[in-house]
Amino acid sequence: DIVVDQKPMESVKEGLRYVYNTKELLGALSLDLFAVLFGGAVAMIPVFAKDILNVGPIGFGWLNAAADIGAMLIIFIITLFPVNAGQGKKLLIAVGGFGICIIVFALSKIFWISFAALVLSGILDGFSMIVRGTIVQLKTPDHMRGRVMSVNSMFINSSNELGQFESGVAAKLMGVIPSVVFGGTMTILVVFTTWFKAPSLRKMEY
């Protein structure tokens, strides 16, 4: 039965409990939280455009749009060629590849390599978002859907904002390039940890 008079905080707690007890959901949402938290190179794009790649406003615009271009491409590709098997494993590989792209972007001194790395990061991030969103829908029963989607939104929104904060703090402490390399490396480390700690997510297929 649907409870209509439940207090908001109780609903949130129930959603968190369900996510925590469903390992595929916990793995998928944690993967997104920490990958975005550590892989937030987008916040540093203005610095890379001006001080490292030495490109003007047009170059900055292309760099800023690169990840979105990649995301649009993968949406079009998956519409034509759906992901048919091994989705959990492919999700982890995509997030790991995203971390590698962030490292390549950090180390590149050539505009087109930086641009290509960001486009590919957008493709991989878009792929992981599609697969992760499908897993969340499939593993959530109808009576829990609103609560779990609220938790999902909380994870996404908090990781985006905290990721930009982490990027700024890390850049201040380490320098811009080392901080972005650190973020990409931590993203890969999160993937390795999830690979072994969440086997049910790794083996997930739909």
Describe every region a protein language model picked out.
Residues 37-47:
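Transmembrane-helix terminus/interface motifs of multi-pass secondary transporters
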